[in-house]
């Protein structure tokens, strides 16, 4: 880290500012953050258990959700007994979770709001991760599609979005969409039968 800072003419004492937690979250390198080592160890064990396909969580797959008003409510209703563990927490419209549904591991991708470059990158990474472990995807969508902003165009949103579409189209894992609202690009990427979704 100090070599990177020195090369850019920054003071090595500013390592936390430029290379710390906030920078790792912003770049997408950090997936989870915990206040203490004990909690971190427990969550690592949870993630490894999830990736291995084991589940010790019992829940009724036919339960009726009492009140589902938001995307986060829907995620809670779909997942067994609050098993959803959010990974790659950030301010994006897209949230990603490891969870169990009827005892089986699933990846849950929820979108509430317009899709930006940050969202497309996050979706691509998550779909590729699920593919590596043969984990089904559940998308929960409430989105009007692309954020039509000049700054998104300048960042190359079309190219970044195309990479997310490619990852989704190449994924052979089962995909199920839960739709509140999916318009344009959001529908095509996160719910369309043509890209492999059922709903």
Give residue spans per PLM region.
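Ligand-binding clefts of soluble mixed alpha/beta catalytic domains
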Residues: 1-199
């Amino acid at each position: 880290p100090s070599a990177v800072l020195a090369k850019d003419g920054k003071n090595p004492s500013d390592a936390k500012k430029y290379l710390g937690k906030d920078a790792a979250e912003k770049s997408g390198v950090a997936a989870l953050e915990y206040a203490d080592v004990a909690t971190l160890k427990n969550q690592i064990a949870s993630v490894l258990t999830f990736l291995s396909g084991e589940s010790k969580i019992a829940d009724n797959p036919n339960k009726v959700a009492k009140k589902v008003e938001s995307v986060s409510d829907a995620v809670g209703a779909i997942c067994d007994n609050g098993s959803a563990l959010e990974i790659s927490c950030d301010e994006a419209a897209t949230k990603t979770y490891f969870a169990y549904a009827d005892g089986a591991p699933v990846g849950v991708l929820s979108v509430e709001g317009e899709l930006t470059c940050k969202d497309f990158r996050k979706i691509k990474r998550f779909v590729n991760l699920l593919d590596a472990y043969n984990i089904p995807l559940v998308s929960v969508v409430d989105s009007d599609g692309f954020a039509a902003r000049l700054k998104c165009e300048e960042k190359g949103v079309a190219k970044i979005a195309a990479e997310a579409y490619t990852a989704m189209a190449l994924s052979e894992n089962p995909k199920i969409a839960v739709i509140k609202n999916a318009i344009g690009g959001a529908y095509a990427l996160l719910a369309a039968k043509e890209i492999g979704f059922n709903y």
